Amino acid sequence: KKQAFKSPKVNFIPDTVSHVNIEGQGYIPSLVVESGDIIEADYFVNTTGQNLKVKNVFNEQYDSIGDTLLTTKAVVYPLPYTNKREQFHPYTVAKTMKNGWRWITPTWERIGTGYTFSENHISVDQAIDEFTTDIGDKSIVPNVVDFRPRVNKQTFKVNSCSIGMANGFLEPLDAPGLALTNTVTFMLEKILSNYYSNFRDKSIKTNNNYHSITLTLANEAIKKSYKFWTTFILNQYKTCHRLDTPFWIDQKHVKWDDWTLAIKDLNAYCDLHKNDYDVMMLAQTIASRNIQFYTPVPKEIKPPQLSETLPPTQHHLDYIESFHKFK
C-alpha cells in the first residue's frame, strides 16, 4: 500500500467516508468524507474490512453463515522463536482445542499463533486461559478479534464492488479469504473492462442489459465460491474425531445440505469426475484425525522410477535465509 501511494498516478486522501450517495438500482455517483469534501468517481471499490464497529456506509447486505461455521472470535499473540531451526517450517499447524482450533504459523521474525473459538460455547476469559495454557505461558495478554461468518448478498453492483473482508468472511481455517479475494479481483478485472467499454453510454447507470447480465453471473459465481469454501471447511470439522465438548458435538450436527451440490460444482469446474472423486475420498484427502495439516519435507526421497537416492532437501530456514542475504 505504501508503495502504491508513492505513484504520481495515485491520489491518496487520508479521510473517513461518512456517507455514500446511492441512486436508483445502486449507482454511486459520489461519496462524502468527514472533512465535507465530495469525491466523485466512475467506479468504487469497498475494502473497509469487517470491523463490526465501522458504520456500514455502503449499505452492504449480508447472508449469515453462522449456523454452519460456529466460530466467532479469535485470540491472537505473536511468539518469539526459542529455537528457530526447529520451529521454522513452511506450513501452518492447525491444532484442535476444546472449543475450536489453534493455528501455529512461523514467519521470518516470529511465530504467529491464535485460537479460533465459538463465543457461544466459551467466554473470552476462558478462551484466553485455554490458549495461554496450551502455549505454556500464562503471562501473555493476547488480542481479541471479533468476526462473523457471512457473505455479501451482492458483491458486484452497477459501478461498485466489495472485496476482501468487506465482501464476507468465513473463518481462519485454510485462509479461504486469500483465495476468495483473488477470485473477486480476477472478476473485477473482467467487469471493469466491460464497464469502461460501455461507460460513455450513460444508460449503464440504469438500463444496460449486457452489464446487468454480467453482474448477475459474477455474483452467482462468487456465491458458489463462498458456498464451496464453507463446505470445504465444514468437512474438516465433521471428519475430525473429537466429540469431547459441546462445541465439537454441535459442529458435528450442523446441517450439510450443500455438500453434494458443492461436489458437483467442483467436478464441473475442475473436471474431477474423471478421477471419480466422492465425499468419502475427499474427506480422507483433506482431513486428518485432529485437523493437524502439515507436510514435512522428508530428508531423502526415493521415487519408484529412480534407483539412486536423491540428495537431502535443503532446510527451509536456509532456503529463506538465502533470499534475505540476497536483498
Annotate each language-model stretch with its function.
Residues 39, 44-53, 101-107, 122, ...:
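Broad hydrophobic/π-residue packing in well-ordered secondary structure
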